[in-house]
């Protein structure tokens, strides 16, 4: 994994972490159930491991797809961007949520190479 790939994929995790920190600091109603230290540590760890998680998920996914998958399905490349964007957001959010287990898996795989 290159530094460029890591920086490109950590931006979504940083964005989510900054939104979380902003929301817990601007909470005027006294609901601080999400503002625990353990939750903050988990979000910071997930932010750091998010690119590794995405790398591991992509590696596992492409291991099971045949090489001619995208050649046979040419309509996938002609799909409008507006229809793909919600799925990309859900995919990035899934990578962030699963960042700790899959991120550690990605780290193990990278160190193995």
UniProtKB/Swiss-Prot annotation:
Keywords: Bacteriocin immunity, Plasmid. The keyword rRNA processing does not apply. Disulfide bonds: none annotated. One of its GO terms (molecular function) is toxic substance binding. GO terms for biological process: bacteriocin immunity. The keyword Metal-binding does not apply. Pfam families: Microcin. Signal peptide: none annotated. It comes from the Bacteria. This protein is able to protect a cell, which harbors the plasmid pKY-1 encoding colicin E1*, against colicin E1*. This is Colicin-E1* immunity protein.
């Amino acid at each position: 994994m290159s530094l460029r790939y890591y920086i490109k994929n950590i931006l979504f995790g940083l964005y989510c972490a900054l939104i979380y920190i902003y929301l817990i600091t601007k909470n005027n109603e006294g609901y601080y159930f999400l503002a625990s230290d353990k939750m903050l540590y988990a979000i910071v760890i997930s932010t750091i491991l998010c690119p590794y998680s995405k790398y591991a998920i992509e590696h596992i996914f492409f291991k099971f797809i045949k090489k001619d998958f995208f050649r046979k399905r040419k309509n996938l490349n002609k799909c409008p961007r507006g229809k793909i964007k919600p799925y990309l957001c859900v995919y990035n959010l899934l990578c962030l949520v699963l960042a700790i287990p899959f991120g550690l898996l990605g780290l193990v795989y990278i160190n193995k190479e």
